[in-house]
């Protein structure tokens, strides 16, 4: 099983695998290209995003700067708005629905690392170099969600349609549809 097949299967994989590193390097360079554009370079920005992302719905806008890890594992619906410093570490798939709005400094993270150090570093190359391992869990965000500034979404989380996540929240568990959550860890505040 290749490292990419392991990644897709949700089992421990080596993110430093040359094939995976090449995909990430390409995406990281495209992030830099996007971040070097002016906001009025709409066509240039759209072309770069088309190269980075798995899917991007019409009418979407990214303030920039952006940081995608693989990019191609991120699927974004129509009329998405991403404010400054959007970071998506998409080792697993990330699905973002239509009409979502993200405040500045939103981070979506899909990789997890084993809690036991020996498991994180259990594989070594012939020269003794540690191969740090991780696995990844997909993140799903429904339509019409709003994330305040500084929200972090952790691996494996699903955020229901119409949910609002308050500024500075760390979302470690699923969020129900049409609810307001906030805090660290994010907790239910009320139905909306």
Short names for language-model regions:
Residues 1-59, 115, 185-192:
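Terminal amphipathic alpha-helical/low-complexity segments used for targeting or macromolecular assembly
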Residues 66-76, 81-157, 184-185, 190-192:
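Flexible, glycine/small-residue-enriched loop-and-beta-strand segment within the central core
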Residues 8, 140-142, 176:
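Residue-level recognition of short, solvent-exposed, well-ordered loop/turn junctions
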Residues 152-182, 186:
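C-terminal/domain-terminus segments
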Residues 4-5, 52, 130-131, 137-138, ...:
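Short secondary-structure boundary/capping segments
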């Amino acid at each position: 099983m290749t490292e990419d097949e392991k990644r897709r299967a949700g089992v421990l994989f080596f993110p430093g695998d040359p094939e995976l590193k090449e995909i990430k390097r390409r995406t990281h360079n495209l992030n830099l290209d996007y971040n070097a554009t002016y906001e009025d370079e709409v066509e240039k920005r759209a072309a770069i995003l088309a190269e980075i992302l798995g899917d991007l719905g019409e009418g979407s806008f990214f303030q920039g700067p952006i940081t995608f890890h693989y990019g191609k594992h991120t699927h974004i619906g129509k009329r998405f708005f991403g404010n400054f410093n959007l970071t998506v570490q998409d080792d697993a798939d990330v699905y973002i629905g239509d009409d979502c709005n993200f405040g500045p400094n939103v981070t979506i993270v899909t990789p997890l690392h084993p809690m036991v150090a020996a498991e994180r570093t259990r594989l070594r190359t012939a020269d003794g170099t540690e191969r740090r391992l991780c696995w990844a869990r997909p993140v799903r965000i429904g339509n019409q969600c709003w994330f305040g500034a500084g929200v972090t979404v952790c691996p494996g989380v699903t955020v229901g349609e119409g949910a609002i996540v308050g500024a500075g929240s760390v979302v470690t568990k699923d969020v129900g549809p049409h609810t307001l959550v906030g805090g660290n860890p994010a907790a239910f505040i009320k139905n909306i």
